[in-house]
Amino acid sequence: MHLNAIAISAFRNIDHVEISFDRRFNVLHGANGQGKTSVLEAIYLLGTMKSFRMAKAHDLIAWNAPHSLVRGDIDKAGVRREIALYLGREGRKARIDRKPVTKLADFFGAVNAVVFSPEEIGMARGGPELRRRYLDRAIFNGDLGYLLLHHEYHRLLKQRNALLRRGERDGLEVWTIQLAEAGARLMVKRRAYLSQIEPLVRQFYRDIAGAGQEVGLAYRCHGLASAEGERDCAAALRELMAAHEAEELRRGATGVGPHRDDVDFILNGRVIRHHGSQGEQRSFVLAVKMAEIEYLERLNGAPPVLLLDDISSELDPERNANLMTFLRGKRMQVFITTTDVSTLRLEGIDTHASFRVSRGTVTPV
């Protein structure tokens, strides 16, 4: 899959730009706050309708503009398509080949994009919400059903929490059963994904840091470590919610379930966020992202688009070189933002396009 061109209008600090891209490497450079990340954000929207920066849709619309427009010309398996996304104050509308999209399934997956940002560099040492967010994004890229299930789980969670806040025991069991069943399906999918990428993470970590390191991933869910399969997980989750019901009524919120789970990154038998050096943590995250790319390529038969948001400033020269060596061996299209082109390792890359970004304008150089 390749993004041939994009048009962006009234989006953050971008008034209007039209950009034609290289099929391999595209470098957007300029000072901070000029619009580099906004271009990556617009690309990501074409595949997900959401910002990877956790912004609300109305926050993406330029000041005093009625709506934003992002339009992409893509080439997927030899078929060219036009994807357009309108962001209005009242919601979003999508079109494919100028026809309205009525089902989300028709839109999602048209652009598979993997983001590697400074936020994700921090997930090895940060809080569990960073690792959950990474995990959910990674699974959704290869499984549209996961996104729908994720939405359903959080809808049920919201309903159950509303009952807990009101202190209503009547009807709580019905929501508990439904939430436990949806939560069990999420947990099984998360565990399956981690088991599939773990050998890849192990391989890439050794490529980066050398042999002799034992690498692992462990899904951590409070009180459910031994439950296997959807049925067992759902039953265990129901029992756990029942056991915590009095406490949850006091707090007005559901305290157990996938929305509270975590992933342990393990190096030589120790959780890396507690015991790993900064270099080990960054190597681990780099290996996890490489594994995600490799997994999606095997699953879909083609690599995703990769969005590297100012990663060169977060990695030392050796890890930058390892990442670029990996990317040179892939057939994927890569978009890189940076404030300093000299930090990039572009040696051996036969073709790339470079763009200067300043005050919301994008100029080929």
Swiss-Prot record:
Subcellular location: Cytoplasm
Positions contributing to ATP binding: G30, A31, N32, G33, Q34, G35, K36, T37
GO cellular component terms given for this protein: cytoplasm
GO terms assigned for molecular function: ATP binding; single-stranded DNA binding
The organism's place on the tree of life at top rank: Bacteria
Entries under Pfam families matching the protein: SMC_N
Major subcellular site: cytoplasm
Free-text function comment from the UniProt entry: The RecF protein is involved in DNA metabolism; it is required for DNA replication and normal SOS inducibility. RecF binds preferentially to single-stranded, linear DNA. It also seems to bind ATP.
Entry's family note: Belongs to the RecF family.
Protein name: DNA replication and repair protein RecF
Organism: Geobacter sulfurreducens (strain ATCC 51573 / DSM 12127 / PCA)
Gene name, Swiss-Prot/TrEMBL: recF
